[in-house]
């Protein structure tokens, strides 16, 4: 028991990453941006119609 107590004091359980702290659980910013889509039109500031269905952040789709 003493060894377990010492180990927990040196390495608390709160130091371990929890499920919500994993990078895979957090959405990637580059995947959400329409500007990073290769079909993005910088003049119109949107994507052509067929590809805007998959990209929720296109301004002129809809």
UniProtKB/Swiss-Prot annotation:
Residues 17-37 are annotated as: Disordered. It comes from the Eukaryota. Disulfide bonds join 46-60, 47-58, 52-61. Residues 1-15 form the signal peptide. The keyword NAD does not apply. The modification Cysteine amide is found at residue 61. Expressed by the venom duct. Residues 16-45 form a propeptide. One of its GO terms (cellular component) is extracellular region. Belongs to the conotoxin M superfamily. The cysteine framework is III (CC-C-C-CC). This is Conotoxin reg3.7. It comes from Conus regius (Crown cone).
């Amino acid at each position: 028991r003493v060894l377990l107590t010492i180990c927990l004091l040196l390495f608390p359980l709160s130091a371990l990453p929890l499920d919500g702290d994993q990078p895979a659980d957090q959405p990637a910013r580059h995947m959400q941006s329409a500007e990073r889509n290769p079909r993005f039109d910088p003049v119109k500031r949107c994507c052509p119609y067929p590809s805007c269905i998959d990209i929720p952040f296109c301004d002129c789709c809809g």
